[in-house]
């Protein structure tokens, strides 16, 4: 009975709609809790220190979720990236061109907009990086919920885009927030990564090898002064993707199947619970539209991501640098670009890393939350509308199969 319940639960957690919904519920609980009469208890909880004395680790619960649990999320992201690079959409240079170009546009444009608008504001020396990332789980969850009538190539494009986007964000985290690196600990982390790679080559399958290697890699990077979530990405990229003839599943697919429900159902929601608790009042809402940092984050996400992803994609297609995904019109791609403005998880992480002042962090988080909500609502509305268009076209084809394909204007080269 317990096994069956656990099996059903993990099956549900693997669906993008459920994962996105749990993430949203966790963020809503945090917001309601911190803005309730019991808000002080929320703050006390997040600031509670949990120490592992022999290892000299003293982190608050909020830091454990940020540095520890998100490493699991980034491990899954690393597995997804490796799969896409080796056997997925990014393995074919022709198909990979568009999501890669779109991801670059979706990182550079928000950063430029944020840097210009927030120039001179406290924290903007690194705060320009806050709006550069797309939340994979949230964006795919919204697409699964509202874009069921959109061609399947939409999910492939958005997933590939978000994976490359997250890779670029991870590189920024490594470059911007690595200070005072300890070479000895960095070498220790590299040795553990080499051990993981060697175990993969030797076809070792026991968790008694991989779990200690993962934990020591995380600890070594933490002690080295490198953000420890990068351990997850590195180990994910070092995991074998192609199965042997005697294997039903490759190690990467097996690990993703096992760990993705834990990431979606526990790790990311707990991070959201501890990170999304932002006091919202009239003062905060007023500052959102007057403070340069808040405006930089909001416009960087909502305008920068949308313009960057869609604009650079349109240019690449028009000039023959990439091809448009089969079945998708420019209006479909615009709707997907709006979903790219859902920053959430990684944007909240970067806000905590980039901004030293508590009040500034809370304001930036509020900007991320408000903008991510706006992007999800706007993207949902656009996807629902596009879904009706695709459904109407399909119905027309079924009723009049001999009259040809009544094409949608957005499917051609026009933006109409």
UniProtKB/Swiss-Prot annotation:
Entries under Pfam families matching the protein: Na_H_antiport_1 (PF06965)
Reaction catalysed by this enzyme: Na(+)(in) + 2 H(+)(out) = Na(+)(out) + 2 H(+)(in)
InterPro entries associated with the record: Na/H_antiporter_dom_sf (IPR023171), NhaA (IPR004670)
Transmembrane segments: 18-38, 59-79, 97-117, 127-147, 167-187, 265-285, 297-317, 333-353, 363-383
One of the GO BP terms on file: regulation of pH
Superkingdom of origin: Bacteria
Listed GO CC annotations: plasma membrane
Membrane topology according to the record: Multi-pass membrane protein
Location(s), subcellular: Cell membrane
Keyword Cell membrane included in the entry's annotation: yes
GO MF annotations, alphabetized: sodium:proton antiporter activity
Region (Disordered): 396-416
Keywords in alphabetical order: Antiport, Cell membrane, Ion transport, Membrane, Sodium, Sodium transport, Transmembrane, Transmembrane helix, Transport
Annotated function: Na(+)/H(+) antiporter that extrudes sodium in exchange for external protons.
Family: Belongs to the NhaA Na(+)/H(+) (TC 2.A.33) antiporter family.
Name of the protein: Na(+)/H(+) antiporter NhaA
Organism per entry: Nocardia farcinica (strain IFM 10152)
Gene (UniProt): nhaA
């Amino acid at each position: 009975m317990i096994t069956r319940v656990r099996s059903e639960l993990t099956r549900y957690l693997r669906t993008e709609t459920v994962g996105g919904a749990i993430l949203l519920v966790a963020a809503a609980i945090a917001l309601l809790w911190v803005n309730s009469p019991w808000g002080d208890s929320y703050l006390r909880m997040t600031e509670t220190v949990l120490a592992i004395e022999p290892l000299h680790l003293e982190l608050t619960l909020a830091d454990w979720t940020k540095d520890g649990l998100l490493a699991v999320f980034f491990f899954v992201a690393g597995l997804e990236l490796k799969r896409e690079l080796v056997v997925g959409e990014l393995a074919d240079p022709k198909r990979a061109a568009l999501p890669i170009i779109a991801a670059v546009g979706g990182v550079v444009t928000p950063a430029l907009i944020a840097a210009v608008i927030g120039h001179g504001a406290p924290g903007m020396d690194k705060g320009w990086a806050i709006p550069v990332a797309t939340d994979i789980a949230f964006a795919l969850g919204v697409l699964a919920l509202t874009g069921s009538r959109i061609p399947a190539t939409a999910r492939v494009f958005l997933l590939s885009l978000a994976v490359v986007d997250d890779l670029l964000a991870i590189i920024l985290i490594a470059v911007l927030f690595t200070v005072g690196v300890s070479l000895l600990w960095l070498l220790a982390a590299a040795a553990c990564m080499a051990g993981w790679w060697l175990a993969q080559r030797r076809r070792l399958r026991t968790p008694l090898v991989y779990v200690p290697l993962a934990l020591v890699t995380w600890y070594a990077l933490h002690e080295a002064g490198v953000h420890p979530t990068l351990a997850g990405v590195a180990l994910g990229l070092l995991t074998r993707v192609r199965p042997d003839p005697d294997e039903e599943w490759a190690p990467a697919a097996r690990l993703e199947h096992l760990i993705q429900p834990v990431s979606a159902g526990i790790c990311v929601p707990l991070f959201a619970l501890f990170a999304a608790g932002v006091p919202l009042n009239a003062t905060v809402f007023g500052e959102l539209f007057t403070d340069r940092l808040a405006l930089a984050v909001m416009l960087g996400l909502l305008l920068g991501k949308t313009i960057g992803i869609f604009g650079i994609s349109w240019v690449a297609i028009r000039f023959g640098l990439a091809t448009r995904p089969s079945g998708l019109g420019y209006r479909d791609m615009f709707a997907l670009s709006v979903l790219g403005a859902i920053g959430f998880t990684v944007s909240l992480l970067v806000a905590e890393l980039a901004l030293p002042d508590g009040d500034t962090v809370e304001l930036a988080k509020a900007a991320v939350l408000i903008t991510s909500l706006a992007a999800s609502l706007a993207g949902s509305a656009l996807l629902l509308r596009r879904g009706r268009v695709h459904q109407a076209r399909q119905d027309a084809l079924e009723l009049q199969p001999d009259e040809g394909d009544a094409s949608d204007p957005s499917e051609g080269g026009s933006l109409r």
